[in-house]
Amino acid sequence: MEMLILVPKITNRLYYIFELMLKDELGIDFKFTTDKDSYLSHEGSKLHYGKYPMPEESGLYQQAANILFEHDIADQDVKICNYKESKAIYPVFNERSLFPFDIFAASFYIISRYEEYLPHVSDNYNRFQPQDSILYKMEMMERPVINLWSIDLGNELVARYPEITLKKKTFRFVPTYDVDAAWAYRNKGFFRTTLSLCRDILRFDKNEIRYRWDVLRKKKMDPFDTFEYQIKLQKELKLSPLYF
């Protein structure tokens, strides 16, 4: 049976994040409605997502921020709040709210990398800098935040509606390697290698000259050439990495 979600209006952002968290993460089918009477008369599982709760409603209520009802990309007043033993964003303050923060707005902001579409200072490779991200400020860069919040959401929904069956998740580890340069000295071609040697000579960089020369004569390994070690690890751990 589908969970009925009451919202003030239906937007693409709503579809995206509810599809991700309810359908993909938890395996819960749902449908939206803007009809309060249909929602109130619905006897199955239901959730009201909006600014204010209705006095007469008997389902679950989650107080909403504005971002999922917007269409343009605009500056957000993203505040950090405490949640359990960690942090969250988009705090809400209605006592009837399922969570003390808008779990859907917060998840959308993070999973869409919304902040990267706003003006920011990029690094030398035109990339968004990690220290500017909201997850860095929340000290949660290395945690699967959306997965953890989805689990919390699922637990709350099942506590209220025991007939809900959550999808069992399976995981696999897929390492990725971003290889900007495969070699530091080797396979650069005669012209580039000669120019680099001339540069080292002009700088009187004896250590660099010696190291480069040893690598070119195959007396030392190229410092960037770690592929044999990577392949060894992949075989030992049975990994199937992706290279970029």
Segments (PLM) and residue ranges:
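Terminal accessory/targeting
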Residues: 1-244
